Amino acid sequence: MSFADTWPYPRWIAHRGAGKLAPENTLAAFRLGAQYGFRMFECDVKLSSDGVPFLLHDATLQRTTNARQKIGPGNSAIASDHPWGTLAQLDAGGWHSRSFAGEPLPTLDAVAAYCIANRYLLNIEIKPTPGSERHTGEIVAQHAVRLWQGQPVPPLLTSFQVEALQGAMETQPELPRGLLLDTLWTGWLETALTLGCQAIVCNHALWDRSSVSQAQSAGFRTLSYTVNDEWAAQRLIDLGTDGIITDRVDLFSPAG
């Protein structure tokens, strides 16, 4: 748990780049979040059919790309069914607003280059396609080690999927990991310990004095998603938690 003792990450983390102010999980979103003063970003990473890690939240492409028009209605909408060459041609910005039309899906390599060049930090949520949890964790971890080689602060890998974190741990145990929770299911603390995690990342409503004490007493850092109200953020600060993931890059000052 020594990594948790010397936690290098800031309190404020921009959700999917810049929350809802820009197309999520794009470099345009990262650039906008940075303009608001954020220095750490959260993003979702999955694999193309040919094993390229890229940013996308959903299992399917329709909500945040023009896949219906570009790929056609008769073809699979599942992102992981397509090679990167196909995915790279999609517009991942036009759905949000006309000003972002033409913004592509970024690879993890592109995001790493941007973050490293600007000394920004990254939280990679591993978002595997069902059935490929362990493999996705392995590949994302391998890429992360290669991309951040020689950098002072590696990315924080998180996932709701235990098998994805197992894959990351077994492949690159030196990378910091965090278990994502939407409920405090039976055995959550023991599972995080078994996975060698450094952090617990909860739905913010799950944190209270008891759960914070349990996690911190076991050596974990305590992070929350997705916090968009001032009262909720203040409650978490008062509880002594360590990190807040927010869409509201326009509301919260990361310097505060």
Model-identified regions with their sequence ranges:
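Phosphate-group recognition and catalysis centered on beta-loop-alpha active-site segments
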Residues: 1-256
